[in-house]
UniProtKB/Swiss-Prot annotation:
Signal peptide extent: 1-19
Entry GO terms, CC: extracellular region
InterPro entries: T-conotoxin (IPR031565)
Comment text on domains: The cysteine framework is V (CC-CC).
Post-translational modification summary for this protein: Contains 2 disulfide bonds that can be either 'C1-C3, C2-C4' or 'C1-C4, C2-C3', since these disulfide connectivities have been observed for conotoxins with cysteine framework V (for examples, see AC P0DQQ7 and AC P81755).
Organism lineage: Eukaryota, Metazoa, Spiralia, Lophotrochozoa, Mollusca
Domain of life: Eukaryota
Tissue: Expressed by the venom duct.
Pfam families recorded: Chi-conotoxin
Residue ranges the record assigns to the propeptide: 20-47
Name of the protein: Conotoxin Pu5.6
Length: 60
């Protein structure tokens, strides 16, 4: 019966540790949303016709 309170405390500590960042962010870190936006923008640019501007405005 002595182990039950210790076990409960350990479970609470493990659950609260998941919300803590393991590593601090550096100035070189970029959020994933900006990476996804860049990939979509590059994909859109490849679909555009270089000589016909109206082609870029038509969603496919």
């Amino acid at each position: 019966m002595r182990c039950v309170p210790v076990f409960v405390i350990l479970l609470l500590l493990i659950a609260s540790a998941a919300s803590i960042d393991a590593q601090q962010k550096t100035k070189d870190d970029a959020p994933l949303t900006s990476l996804n936006d860049n990939a979509l923008q590059q994909h859109w640019n490849k679909r555009c016709c270089p000589r016909k501007i109206w082609c870029c405005m038509i969603p496919r």
